[in-house]
């Protein structure tokens, strides 16, 4: 790759100029935040310059543009990633060290952008990285949340949500583009007019806001392509401040329009338990969809005029889950109401342009909206959805015996609700799942009626991760070792990692793999001491489960294992375990009481075990607050056991399993999601698999013969003891007992089969950890996992999307 700075001296000269211009001080007199701001502004300027060249090249080559719509983009810190992708990280680090600075400290000043929460948003970010690497003209389209989901704090063991003030010191990567703002209307009423035999529609009396875009450059590895992520912020139409109201003491009312508009883009996933929250969520979804569709059509028109029938040739619109489901009807609205196309012509364009990724298995978890809410807030869009639904229903031959049930399952409007997944499928030419088992379940269960009607639409695209961020950037010690062994071509093509299998018999190399892991464990231990005040031993096994908290992900099963090991150690002097640090991290949705109770239980157990001198030399429990990309990049490289223990058939794919595998952790998991493909690639002998399979789960549920009380009563000494401890005060010292968890397991009959899989899980854990003292074989399996993980690069996933869905 061609470097953007020809020498260290040239970089130093320009960097000093930026520092002086932005801080008014010499480098030696600045703080690390000053140094970060100057460096990020400098690199962002370089990136925007390459972005302009990328846009020009795309126009000249007539490239098809891919617009990736997602409610989340969890992009993480960008500075280190961009220095790596531009090929200048070593040069910059050396130059700053020569100036008396520390690049690592400078990079730590960067906030984690609160533009997403979990796997959905991180997947979208990895896809943007890979689109840029692959030279695809790819554009992210999302929301700019002022406060994100929330910043998680732990107070007396409980999750407490506080606003994430990530923008408080500015964000040097973004550029506001008020010239590209789009007017968005809510509410109002539909007005029709007749022209010949055609009816045309508009909406009057709307409550309008401005969607204002902020552009963030997405630098591809090699520095040849820089794409854009466009995030929309809601602002009032008129920046009107009511001075009379202010002088009369109505300080809130004086700026009410701004407050109401900005609320739309204030936080990710507003609590939708009440009508106000539901309206806010629906406004968010429409705002970023409508603004994005308007913008891409404007771009198309500048380059191709009003040749709308050519749109599918030059544009692909991809919807990441159902939050952008209104892409189809909004595109219909503009093509018909503003451009004068007939329904049939507009529909032909929509269904050849839009594609949809499903991330959900459970039918009850699919997004739905009350018709009353939807039709009031978005009357014209609802009219179009109603017509799409009517035409869909007309396609059924109701004389056929299966038609009634198929219509019920596939209709967009049903039982007073707008079903967004059905809307997404009907408006798309492609529907994909995100792991082989997930795609099979979609066709066999969740969306089986659509699959029966249109089997050619359905395909699988197993998720992937950015190996440059989550391996090269996150794990520099291991990455350096890999590069010494096989060269650096793996940065460009992760499939090259498979060459590492040649070193599985090299004792010296395996020892260095172990030394790299220990260095990463020390780094994480220092972070835990600094952030949590807890001392953890880097010579213990690091057993890691880090992900969003949800019942089906079964963090409860994990902490029950810890409770069991604790009890057995105290009760049986002959019982021995491999010394282990159990590491948890992740957020629970603010309204998800059960998940928050599991977090409280983990911290309650940690409070007891970490303060019990009888065990805390062999057991520690660590909950790392506020899981985000930056601390994930410390956790993944240090992990030795990757806990992927969802109830079989519930996890669509997962990506933490891939990140942990790539960093040399061994998977302890069920045959669910992408775990199945990990086992296929790395071999069952190099992982630890337990528990019921998806068919076994389905059969057990169908039998009606699962009774939680029977499971517990058959094992009073171990399971019975754990269940009792939830309510007998054993772990209540920090914040009380855990009656709701006890009730969920025993009186709601343990829906996620925690008790059923318990013994299989603990046995698998004991068997796996018993092999830990054989360092050479453990390191061999760790290296083998890394070697076989290249298939999970998001570069591979994006090539499949490009070739098989977008045809870009």
Model-derived features: positions:
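A conserved ligand/cofactor-binding region detector
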Residues: 1-808
């Amino acid at each position: 790759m061609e470097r953007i700075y020809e020498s260290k001296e040239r970089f130093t000269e320009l960097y000093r100029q930026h520092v002086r211009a932005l801080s008014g001080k010499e480098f030696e007199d600045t703080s690390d935040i000053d140094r970060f701001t100057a460096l990020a502004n400098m690199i962002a300027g370089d990136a925007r310059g390459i972005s302009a060249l990328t846009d020009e090249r795309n126009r000249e080559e007539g490239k098809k543009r891919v617009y990736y719509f997602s409610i989340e983009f969890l992009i993480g810190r960008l500075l280190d990633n961009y220095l790596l992708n531009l090929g200048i990280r070593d040069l910059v680090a050396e130059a700053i060290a020569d100036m008396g600075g520390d690049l690592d400290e400078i990079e730590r000043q960067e906030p984690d952008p609160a533009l997403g929460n979990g796997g959905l948003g991180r997947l979208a970010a990895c896809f943007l990285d890979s689109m840029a690497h692959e030279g695809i003209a790819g554009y992210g389209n999302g929301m700019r949340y002022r406060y994100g989901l929330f910043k998680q704090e732990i107070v007396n063991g409980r999750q407490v949500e506080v606003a994430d003030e990530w923008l408080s010191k500015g964000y040097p990567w973004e550029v506001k583009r008020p010239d590209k703002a789009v007017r968005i209307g809510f509410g109002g009423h539909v007005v029709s007019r007749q022209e010949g035999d055609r009816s045309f529609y508009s909406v009057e009396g709307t409550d309008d806001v401005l969607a204002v875009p902020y552009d963030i450059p997405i630098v591809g590895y090699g520095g040849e392509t820089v794409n854009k992520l466009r995030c929309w912020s809601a602002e009032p139409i008129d920046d009107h401040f009511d001075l009379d109201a202010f002088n009369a003491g109505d300080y809130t009312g004086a700026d009410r329009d701004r407050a109401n508009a900005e609320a739309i883009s204030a936080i990710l996933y507003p609590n939708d338990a009440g009508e106000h929250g539901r309206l806010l969520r629906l406004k968010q979804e429409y705002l970023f969809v409508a603004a994005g569709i308007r913008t891409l059509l404007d771009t198309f028109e500048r380059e191709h005029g009003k040749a709308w029938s050519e749109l599918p040739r030059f544009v692909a619109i991809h919807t990441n889950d159902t939050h952008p489901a209104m892409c189809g009807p909004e595109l219909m609205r503009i093509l018909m109401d503003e451009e004068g196309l007939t329904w049939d012509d507009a529909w032909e364009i929509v269904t050849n342009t839009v594609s949809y990724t499903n991330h959900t298995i459970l039918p009850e978890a699919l997004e739905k909206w009350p018709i009353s809410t939807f039709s009031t807030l978005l009357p014209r869009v609802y009219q179009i959805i109603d017509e799409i639904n009517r035409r869909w229903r007309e396609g059924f031959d109701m004389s056929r015996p299966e038609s009634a049930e198929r219509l019920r399952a596939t209709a967009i409007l049903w039982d007073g609700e707008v079903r967004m997944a059905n809307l997404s499928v009907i408006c798309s030419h492609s529907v994909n799942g995100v792991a082989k088992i997930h795609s099979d379940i979609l066709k066999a269960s969740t969306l089986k009626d659509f699959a029966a009607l249109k089997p050619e639409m359905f395909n699988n695209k197993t998720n992937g991760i950015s190996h440059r961020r989550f391996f090269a950037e996150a794990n520099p010690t291991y990455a350096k070792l890999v590069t010494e062994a096989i060269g650096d071509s793996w940065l460009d093509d992760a499939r090259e990692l498979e060459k590492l299998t040649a070193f599985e018999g090299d004792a010296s190399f395996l020892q260095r793999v172990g030394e790299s892991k220990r260095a990463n464990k020390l780094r994480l231990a220092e972070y835990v001491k600094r952030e949590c005040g807890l001392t953890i031993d880097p010579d213990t096994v690091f057993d890691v489960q880090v992900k969003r908290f949800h019942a089906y992900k079964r963090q409860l099963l994990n902490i029950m294992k810890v409770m069991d090991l604790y009890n057995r150690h105290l009760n049986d002097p002959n019982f021995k375990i491999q010394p282990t640090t159990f590491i948890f991290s992740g957020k629970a949705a603010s309204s998800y009481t059960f998940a928050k109770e599991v977090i409280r239980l983990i911290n309650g157990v940690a409070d007891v075990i970490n303060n019990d001198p009888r065990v805390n030399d062999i057991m520690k429990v660590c909950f790392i607050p506020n899981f985000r990309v930056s601390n994930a990049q410390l956790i993944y490289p240090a992990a030795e056991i990757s806990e992927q223990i969802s109830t079989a058939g519930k996890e669509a794919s997962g990506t933490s399993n891939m990140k942990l595998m790539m960093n040399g952790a061994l998977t302890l998991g069920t045959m669910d999601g992408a775990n199945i493909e990990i086992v296929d690639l790395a071999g069952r002998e190099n992982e630890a698999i337990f528990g019921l399979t998806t068919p076994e789960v389905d059969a057990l549920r169908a039998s009606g013969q699962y009774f939680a009380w029977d499971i517990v009563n058959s094992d009073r000494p171990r399971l019975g003891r754990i269940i009792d401890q939830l309510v007998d005060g054993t772990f209540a010292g920090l914040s009380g007992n855990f009656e709701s968890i006890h009730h969920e397991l025993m009186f709601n009959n343990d829906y996620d089969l925690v008790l059923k899989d318990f013994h299989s899980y603990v046995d698998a854990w004991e068997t796996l950890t018993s092999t830990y003292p054989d360092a050479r074989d453990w390191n061999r399996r760790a290296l083998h996992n890394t070697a076989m993980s290249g298939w999970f690069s998001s570069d591979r996933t994006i090539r499949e999307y490009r070739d098989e869905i977008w045809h870009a």
